[in-house]
């Protein structure tokens, strides 16, 4: 099919966006993290963190617009996130008072807590009768981005505090609900998970911005 000269060139814009995203991903994952300076690694994980949170927000909005009417919104808003038990700074003052290694550890713990759920989320979205290819591809991408971000943070922590590791947090009990044949139950769990993922990626993004400003620019930013 031949395109007319007046047809909007959306394909070019989408291609540029895709290339930009791919380059950002390759910057964080192509070369071993130990070869980068800590400053460069901070810069790249902050960029990846911001992108990951933006992606999580888009996925949540897309899911809510398509499936929001099939879930009980009031009850879901009261449902706690599975990461709620992870102790984190509650406000800006506590974030700035926290030690760098502690902010890194809690960020790692939050991301680790999403590794297992994301595997089940991807499988559940793949079987949604009314799901879209975009929702599935974005969810898969979230899984990859969070893994890349986790690896970058673990490298930074190993430099800030050699031998330190984040707390192991793997408790998650709702995977069986994602396999439910009841549409409302399944969509309800997905809605909570996408909402919580948006919340947690935003929290990690804020922590990393503080760390970058403090540890790389001595708070002159």
UniProtKB/Swiss-Prot annotation:
Superkingdom of origin: Eukaryota
Keywords: Disulfide bond, Hormone, Secreted, Signal
A Pfam family of this chain: Hormone_1
PROSITE patterns attached to this UniProt entry: SOMATOTROPIN_1, SOMATOTROPIN_2
Coiled coil: none
Disulfide feature: 81-196, 213-221
UniProt KW Cell membrane keyword: no
Molecular-function GO term, any one: prolactin receptor binding
GO cellular component: extracellular region; extracellular space
Keyword Secreted: yes
Signal peptide bounds: 1-30
GO annotation, biological process: cell surface receptor signaling pathway; female pregnancy; mammary gland development; positive regulation of lactation; positive regulation of receptor signaling pathway via JAK-STAT; response to nutrient levels
Subcellular location: Secreted
Location, primary (coarse class): secreted
InterPro entries: 4_helix_cytokine-like_core, Somatotropin/Prolactin, Somatotropin_CS
Family, similarity comment: Belongs to the somatotropin/prolactin family.
Protein name per the record: Prolactin-3B1
The encoding gene: Prl3b1
């Amino acid at each position: 099919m031949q395109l007319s000269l007046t047809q909007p060139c959306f394909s070019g814009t989408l291609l540029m966006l895709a290339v930009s995203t791919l380059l950002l991903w390759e910057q964080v994952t192509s070369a071993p993290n130990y070869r980068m300076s800590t400053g460069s690694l901070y810069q790249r994980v902050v960029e990846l963190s911001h992108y990951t949170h933006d992606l999580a927000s888009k996925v949540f909005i897309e899911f809510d617009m398509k499936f929001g009417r099939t879930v009980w919104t009031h009850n879901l808003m009261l449902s706690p996130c599975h990461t709620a038990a992870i102790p984190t700074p509650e406000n800006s003052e506590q974030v700035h008072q926290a030690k760098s290694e502690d902010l890194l550890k809690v960020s790692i713990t939050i991301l680790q807590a999403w590794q297992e759920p994301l595997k089940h989320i991807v499988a559940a979205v793949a079987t949604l009768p009314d799901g879209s290819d975009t929702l599935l591809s974005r969810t898969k991408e979230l899984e990859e981005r969070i893994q890349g971000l986790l690896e970058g943070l673990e490298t930074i922590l190993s430099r800030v505090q050699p031998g330190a590791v984040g707390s192991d947090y793997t408790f998650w009990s709702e995977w069986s609900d994602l396999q439910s044949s009841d549409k409302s139950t399944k969509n309800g769990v997905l809605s909570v998970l996408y909402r919580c993922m948006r919340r947690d990626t935003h929290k990690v993004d804020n922590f990393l911005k503080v760390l970058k400003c403090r540890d790389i620019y001595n708070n002159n930013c």
